[in-house]
Design a protein with these regions (language model features):
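Bacterial N-terminal signal peptides
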Residues: 11-21
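Cell-wall glycan-active module
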Residues: 2-7, 22-365
């Protein structure tokens, strides 16, 4: 997923996948799951080096309780593993070379709208609401929270800001779980805290970042046998692992090479995707029309896709080869961001998080 802001990654060696205990689809709460009990268990599971353990435990327990999620060790460790991978439990993590990245983004936007660089630099010399010029603030920016605030001020106060960015702040993720701000804004209903400002600003707080990050990780039903597929979905989008397995089945049935990225259709476009065209090639064997195929693929961002005739018939054909085709695989997506300086993939991210999850489960014993 190409974004101006992509989740942070910490270098570790890729480990082999281990079979997980428990079903990854079970996220409903149990009657005995009291907030105090969840907090107590979190204090046991949090890594030893985490500061303000009570604060982290309280915010995470609140998210589980208010969202009705099962606070099993599997689920709690999954949340802690993602948080450790993304920010090492820093509510406002520093990003290396963020000032340079920000200036490059501004220059890119200026070139795109044909605004001379010197005009942009002149506009950035204007004093911002905190008394410092935008240039000064950009030169010293260290975190995405700071950068988001700079862009908010620049867009609201300076005409040049709207020329370059419209009304859209280019910082797209934030907080200790590096959750998408657009996701948070779309899922703000039921947020248990009084919002002092905007949902964007809440994402950069520990309580908000954890609430929306946990919702993104566990707040949807999935029939995954292992949590690692949720970790991949956290990075690539809900149901990306399931959809990538569907794409692989289609590719093997047709001989057509497909990107196993989990994107089944071109959302927002009438043009058929490569996956849809490949499925159409199976139309006669599936006994389905092009329009019926498209309607089924449109459900690819929900659990309902698994109940469609298309899903069932494709896997029925795939299973006839003698070996049952997997219903979930790690998507083959290369991560792109100015913050990433080497080749990383969604599978790399998921495997990293899974390693941390396993270490957390050891602490649960």
């Amino acid at each position: 997923m190409s974004r101006f802001s992509i989740p942070l990654f910490r270098p570790l060696c890729v480990l082999a996948l281990l079979v997980l205990a428990g079903c990854a689809s079970k996220t409903t709460t149990t009657p005995e799951s009291r907030p105090a009990d969840v907090r107590a268990q979190l204090l046991k599971l949090l890594p030893d080096n985490v500061k303000d353990r009570q604060g982290w435990a309280t915010d995470i327990a609140t998210a589980f309780t208010t969202q009705g999620l099962d606070p099993s060790n599997e689920n709690l460790c999954s949340v802690l593993a993602v948080t450790e991978q993304e920010s090492t439990f820093n509510a406002d993590p520093q990003v290396p070379n963020l000032s340079k990245i920000a200036w490059q983004e501004i220059d890119r936007r200026a070139e795109k709208v044909h605004v001379p660089a010197f005009l942009v630099r002149t506009a950035l010399l204007i004093k911002s609401p905190n008394g410092k010029s935008y240039s000064e603030r950009l030169d010293k920016v260290r975190t995405e929270k700071e950068l988001s605030a700079i862009f908010d001020d620049f867009i609201d106060m300076v005409p040049m800001g709207q020329t370059l960015f419209g009304r859209l702040n280019p910082v797209h993720t934030g907080g200790p779980m590096q959750v998408s701000i657009a996701f948070a804004e779309a899922n703000a209903k039921g947020y248990p805290y009084t919002v002092d400002g905007t949902i964007r600003q809440e994402v950069f707080s520990r309580r908000g970042g954890m609430y929306f990050g946990i919702k993104h990780l566990l707040g949807y039903p999935a029939n995954y046998p292992q949590s690692i597929y949720r970790f991949a979905d956290f990075n690539a989008g809900w149901y990306a692992s399931r959809n990538a397995a569907f794409q692989r089945a289609v590719s093997r049935l047709t001989g057509i090479k497909l990107a196993l990225d989990g994107d089944l259709i071109n959302y927002g476009s009438d043009k058929a995707s490569a996956t849809e065209l490949a499925v159409r090639a199976l139309g006669k064997r599936l006994d389905m029309s092009d329009s019926a195929i498209h309607r089924a693929l449109e459900k690819g961002n929900s659990l309902d896709f698994e109940d469609t005739s298309l899903y069932e018939r494709v896997f029925a054909l795939a299973d006839k080869s003698g070996t049952k085709a997997p219903r979930a695989i790690l998507p083959g997506i290369t991560l792109e961001s100015p913050k990433i300086t080497r080749k990383l993939t969604t599978a790399w991210f998921a495997q990293r998080v899974d390693d941390r999850r396993q270490r957390c489960l050891v602490r649960a014993k």
